[in-house]
């Protein structure tokens, strides 16, 4: 029996694994986030164990013939390291790029960032978390001076008065979380859901608002307009704990309900209902998710809702405030420890000299040798194989060709690389394009920490030994680092790296033991915003996880901002934002809005869940309203074609009354949806606009 | 424009909503320090269209200011309040203020708005030239403040001197809003409208009839086809012989473009100041006009959204983008008043096309769309705003609709499914979290049995009520049904 957590979303539900012969069995375990509940993804999570599709030997593809052949680990790692070294010699260090994932453990994310900066010396590292909650992260940093998805435990939802969910379908994307909503309603609280689709989450709402995709921002401006007009803002809180309100207050004078109605398609009366609900509530919780965040104005959208929460005096108050419902399993921890292009461990910024000095000392290198800021995820992919861009890419924990926006273009960029290396457990769509595929362990076979959506650091523990031939990502990193010549400060292998090392320092080490790496991570995060230095594996086991910031000697911080925000003056900042609208508006040729999202039984690009036989894999579909179906002559179950300026896909129609008639929806777990999506980026978070673009549908 | 864009002096005459939006556009393009705003009112630019909301009491007056005074100063904008412009001297490219000072310009923008029409009612202006104290206009924040003072002197609602009744002259959008606002405050209101139905510029006679009926239900008497001719001590006399006893007369009878400055400067003025697609006067490349005072393509508008769109285009033009062009604008007029729902799209009185219409005078609803080539080109929704957001989107974006779609949009939305749980077919999914069908639940004996064998209710918990109901209504047959068991086998 091994106590661990689910391999999928950011709830990281607690579960227990036990061995039944060759099989692993999932059973319930009490953990505050899920209280023993699991969705079918969790219950069937062990199904990948023993899958015939599991890779158990490194594979090398012959570029000329396209044929795959098995290789030994030494052959594969030698090949990769020598190519990396050669490319670096010709094009410089930034020619080698690394792409990580929000599903990797903290230890892997940390080690990957270190590997890129120290072993490869490249600035070109980023990860798929950019496509997850980066807009909320950017907004949180601007408003609060820190980004922790939920600054309070998830179960606090049950004890607030009004919970506003903006662009979240948690009942399908993280089902056990919906229990907290139900309990809130049992306690007499109200749930508000804002979504272009009436989802199972929306069905739980006391008030459901159905805006045009891309207009959550003006809705927030309209709510604040009404709150200010009614004198319902918390003037004392604003004066004592915030700055910048006057400009924001004035800016919303231009967003009266009928103006908002025209832009958002939400009736003025509904907006008034929402404002009056908020004005009369003691505690209000505003939660955003991808629906609000995955936009070219995603950061501004989150800021606008943050302004509402701040104007009501909620952040820092118990059972109230603003939070982001992070998506990926380690979306939170993944962004804190250095696999993001602009960050070093502990949520330190890579252009901060003090941060560089601290982390370089932990790594045993000269801060001067650390590269600076690199490209953001989409910009990195967009540059691959171009004259100025990287010539190689190492991919860990991501299935880019399914999950990137404008996927056809991204696939063409991958094809122009000199070297594509993918570490994965199965032959994913991205792995299938690689030169070298490295078979790696999956969740139940390895140990490591994750930081869930609440900022709670939890521990996944290995329950079984991996199949023969499979190694951990940590082994891959150490193996490559050793070959690239920086083990214990001694140059070995293919290419002595021209790195000056500080005399007296031991030089970087490349452990493959998670707990050892975590100890190093604690030192690297010490004094940073996301301070893990007081967290140990034992504490995590004993305390049902530990919330950061947790400096040594601290009990951890389940609830933030009670006294101060993280800006130097201790105050939260109101930030004046304007509505620009979606980057791509409907035209005569593409008269509809397309939005994308998830279904319950699949996770992300489906690389894992589609290979679990107990999960239905019905393929993509196109959700459309009967009015639109009539207009284009579509019938439920019959194929329809969705086109955007970037591509097209065909899938069966699902005719439902729960979607706006001017909008179509396609789930993104299967190849296709992201051939359609727009790669317009948010100026601050560099989040692509997954959630809205112009589209046409034909039967 | 003859001057280089970089250091041109931009002078905006007017401090209304169009001017404020233009300033925001100029500031966003770095032109704030070159901008001077000459505003006649003493208030910073505010949201004029919410005045009736202030009157009604839903908005505090302080919430209307569009920017703080400091905001302008911080961005280098020279905002001069209480500054009345008397002349534009195009020869010297200066504007002259009432105090005879002159302000030089390279580009001057007229954003002078509209001037309320004063209907020719004898007795409104007294012998000494002052206005009868019972008469109020309703265009500015000061008008609104005066009215509020009258209504609620020192907050003493029981004060016998407070007005108890009011006559609103004008049955347009503003008249209806003011009437509702006063009624909400407990004032008995009556409306006098010269045309033969309410909202005559926006809706047809049958919709107007519905509106009149709704107003009557709300306690407001409406006099149509009647003109106020004289205000006496007995009250307001109408040309139909009625005399309306009243404490208050509010004038809301429309307005006309305020173009006197342009006329004096010998610029072409028809109904408004005539401008081209760059909002430039057709007579002088350094003079522009936006908002209610401007006439573009033979159209003057009295609405804020076209004014703002013009402001956006002009900011681009003044920043040097000569390709920016104003190509007209679709107007959506929304009545803002309690218990009175009206939305007018475009000009349903003037547009041609197929008319789709659904009315229920008993319920006080009248919904009409004018459709041409599958597109909604105009419409009026009275008394029932269902799907107003969707209809507005289709109108704004000129979406080509299906053959029957316009009609379907006007019909009531089909009510939510509300399917009776016991009727669920065996293959209907009850628990999405675990993927469990109604049949599999029916095959279970108890909630524990359901949890253990199907894992339904163990995810989000949302299906628990449905599961309980299914268990309660399951056919109380012998222990387990073999067919259902085998069904279960095939689905897992």
Residue ranges and their predicted role:
Chain B
Residues 427-441, 452-472:
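Local cysteine-cluster metal-coordination motifs and their immediate loop/turn environment
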Residues 5-9, 28, 293-389, 416-438, ...:
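Mid-to-C-terminal Rossmann-like scaffold of FAD/NAD(P)H-dependent oxidoreductases
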Residues 130-158, 234-237, 242-309, 400, ...:
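FAD-site-proximal beta/loop scaffold in flavoenzymes
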Residues 32-34, 73-96, 103, 184-277, ...:
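A Rossmann-like FAD-binding core segment of flavoenzymes
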Residues 14-17, 139-140, 169-172:
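Glycine-rich Rossmann-fold phosphate-binding loop(s) that bind the pyrophosphate
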Residues 2-11, 66-165, 237-240, 248-252, ...:
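FAD-binding core/adjacent interface of flavoenzyme oxidoreductases
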Residues 2-78, 176-202:
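Beta1-alpha1 glycine-rich phosphate/pyrophosphate-binding loop at the start
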Residues 65, 162-167, 173-229, 307, ...:
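Rossmann-like dinucleotide-binding cores of NAD(P)H-dependent redox enzymes
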